C-alpha cells in the first residue's frame, strides 16, 4: 500500500490510475476484510475533471456514492470487487463505516497534534487517512457514535463546541488513492499493517483527539474575538 505521511513531513499526492484502484480495493477486501463499494469517478470535460454525477458544484467530485442504497452494494468478496472495478476501473473506493470500523473525523491540524501526542504516549493506533479537504480520520472499533459525546464531556469539552465527527453506521469514508477532483487524493497518514489489524477502541484515542480539537476551537474563538 502507499507510503504514509509522517507527523511533520509532506508527500506528493499520487495520481489516481484505474489499475491502482482495482488493486487497492482488492487488498482492502482480502487483507483487511473490509467491505468496499464503487463510487463516482472523474470525467474529463473541456479540459476539466468533473464528477460523473454531472453536478458542476459537486462537493466531493469523484468520491461519493452513485446511488442512495449504496449500503447494499458494499461487499467483502474479492471476486465481486474485481468484477465491479473491471467494469468501471476509475470508480472511487468507498468504505462503509459502522461495520468493520468507525472513523473519528477531525481537522487536519488537530489530527496531526493528536497523532504526535498519541505516539509519545505509545498508544496503539489503527489506520489513519488524510483527505484533500484537510480532514484526518482515525479508524476505531465500531460503536464510537454512542460513546463519544459522554467521553468528550468527561474531558471537559462540549461536543457541540469542538469539530470532532464520528462516522458510523449508515455512513462511509473514501479510501486511498481515491481523488477528490483536482484537490488531490486521499492518503494514509498511518497505513494499514499487520500490526494494526486489531483496531483500537475509541477510549484509547479520545483524550488526545478531544484535547487537540478543543485547543483548535479555543484558538479559533480567540482569533474571531481579536
Predicted region positions:
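Signature for HUH/AEP ssDNA processing cores
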Residues: 2-133, 143, 194-211, 215-226
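Catalytic core of tubulin tyrosine ligase-like
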Residues: 138
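DNA replication initiation modules
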Residues: 143-226
Amino acid at each position: 500500500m502507499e507510503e504514509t505521511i509522517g507527523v511533520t513531513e509532506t508527500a506528493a499526492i499520487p495520481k489516481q490510475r484505474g489499475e491502482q484502484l482495482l488493486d487497492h480495493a482488492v487488498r482492502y477486501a482480502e487483507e483487511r476484510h473490509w467491505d468496499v463499494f464503487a463510487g463516482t469517478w472523474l470525467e474529463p470535460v473541456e479540459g476539466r475533471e468533473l464528477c460523473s454525477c454531472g453536478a458542476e458544484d459537486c462537493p466531493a467530485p469523484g468520491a461519493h456514492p452513485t446511488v442512495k442504497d449504496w449500503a447494499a452494494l458494499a461487499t467483502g468478496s474479492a471476486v465481486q470487487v474485481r468484477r465491479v472495478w473491471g467494469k468501471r476501473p476509475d470508480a472511487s473506493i468507498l468504505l462503509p463505516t459502522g461495520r468493520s470500523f468507525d472513523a473519528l473525523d477531525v481537522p487536519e491540524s488537530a489530527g496531526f497534534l493528536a497523532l504526535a501526542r498519541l505516539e509519545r504516549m505509545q498508544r496503539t493506533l489503527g489506520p489513519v487517512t488524510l483527505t484533500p479537504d484537510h480532514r484526518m480520520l482515525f479508524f476505531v472499533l465500531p460503536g464510537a457514535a454512542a460513546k463519544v459525546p459522554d467521553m468528550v464531556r468527561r474531558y471537559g469539552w462540549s461536543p457541540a463546541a469542538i469539530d470532532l465527527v464520528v462516522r458510523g453506521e449508515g455512513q462511509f469514508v473514501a479510501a486511498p488513492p481515491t481523488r477528490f477532483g483536482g484537490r488531490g487524493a486521499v492518503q494514509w497518514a498511518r497505513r494499514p499493517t499487520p500490526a494494526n489489524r486489531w483496531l483500537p477502541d475509541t477510549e484509547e484515542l479520545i483524550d488526545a483527539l478531544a484535547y487537540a480539537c478543543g485547543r483548535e476551537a479555543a484558538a479559533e474563538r480567540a482569533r474571531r474575538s481579536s
